[in-house]
Amino acid sequence: MTGTANPFGKILLYIDGSESSITAALFAIALSKAHGSMLRVIYVVNDNLLTELLGAKVFVQMEKMDYERDLEEDGKRKLNYIVKLAEKKGVKVQTILRKGIVHEEVSREVVSSDCDLLIQGELGEVLSLRDSFYEEGERILRKVSCPVLIVRNKQKVDRLYESV
């Protein structure tokens, strides 16, 4: 942009591997390309959930460790997929893989990277008030200290991604 600072200089994209987070990734890539923004992508292995499952005796310790390793590998694959999508459009991406409580890790990254915008996929369907307190996308939305863009409409985003 001529004569003005880029309002989206640092974009953080949160992905969880859902179809809506892939749609959000396509949008984040297109926006980053259009504005020359730095794009960082974060995936968080929810080890809090794993600990709860261990405590509820759904897992034994060895199963928890195996499942956690599987989730880390899955996170790496998803991050690498986003990198490939970005490379197709000439956008450089920095990936971040964390373990912890999802909304806290995303919020921590927003602060540490001083991001201008957080992008995430469409929120999951909330069937009860209780669900709204536990849906990670909702918790992220409430916790972070920067503007948040929720991406919807896969067909429109696909066209936008293809056009850049």
Model-derived segments and their meaning:
Residues 44-74, 159-164:
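Acidic, proline/glycine-rich short linear motifs
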Residues 56-60, 112-114, 136-137:
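Short, hinge-like loop/turn segments at secondary-structure boundaries
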Residues 24, 51-54, 107-108, 130-131, ...:
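Short, well-ordered secondary-structure micro-motifs
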Residues 120-143, 157-161:
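Glycine-rich, Arg-bearing micro-motifs that act as flexible, cationic patches
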Residues 3-61, 143:
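Small/aliphatic-rich secondary-structure junction motif
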Residues 1-6, 84-118, 155-160, 164:
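Structural beta-alpha unit
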Residues 42, 94-98, 149:
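General small-molecule cofactor/ligand-binding pocket signal
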Residues 146-158:
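Short, flexible loop segments at boundaries between secondary-structure elements
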